[in-house]
A protein has these predicted regions:
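C-terminal helical cap(s) of enzyme catalytic domains, especially alpha/beta-barrels
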Residues: 125-140
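C-terminal accessory segment of soluble enzyme catalytic cores
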Residues: 110-113, 124
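A short, acidic, amphipathic alpha-helical segment used as a generic capping/interface helix at domain edges
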Residues: 55-64, 96-110
């Protein structure tokens, strides 16, 4: 299976919104072998308001692409805010998305069952082990 990733929309990259991803996917002959990786930083940077309208973003994702076609999540915070088109990952809880968003994500019955790939830099004060423990601690 090939997974297309949601992109932040910097420069001329493809996949900067759900409609572009849907168009690409619709052009693939064997649709059963193509899906989406939802990148949390990229979605915010592309202009999807995950902080204040999580349900609306998920509804739009479902309407345009279909939640069943989302196969994985890149979990990361964003150094920049909504619609910045910057693509600069931040450690969990240290960026613009914040802990309330990640609490919502890891407790969303649809999204929580997907593979989540931590995509942050290890800092001297924060390790991937710390971030994984933080995310697990948010699960109800």
């Amino acid at each position: 299976m090939v997974l297309l990733e949601t992109m932040a929309g910097k420069g001329t990259e493809c996949g900067r919104n759900f409609d572009e991803l849907a168009t690409i996917m619709d052009g693939v002959e064997n649709k059963a072998n193509v899906g989406v990786t939802f990148d949390t930083c990229h979605a915010l940077d592309a202009g999807y308001d995950l902080e204040n309208d999580y349900d609306g973003v998920m509804r739009q994702l479902n309407e345009v692409i279909g939640l069943a076609r989302v196969k994985a999540i890149h979990v990361n915070d964003s150094q920049f805010g909504l619609g910045s088109h910057k693509d600069r990952h931040a450690n969990i809880g240290e960026g613009q998305l914040g802990i309330p968003f990640f609490t919502r994500l890891v407790n969303d019955p649809t999204m929580a069952k997907l593979p989540m790939i931590l995509e942050t830099k290890e800092q001297t004060s924060t390790t991937h082990r710390d971030e994984i423990a933080l995310l697990r601690g948010l699960v109800d």
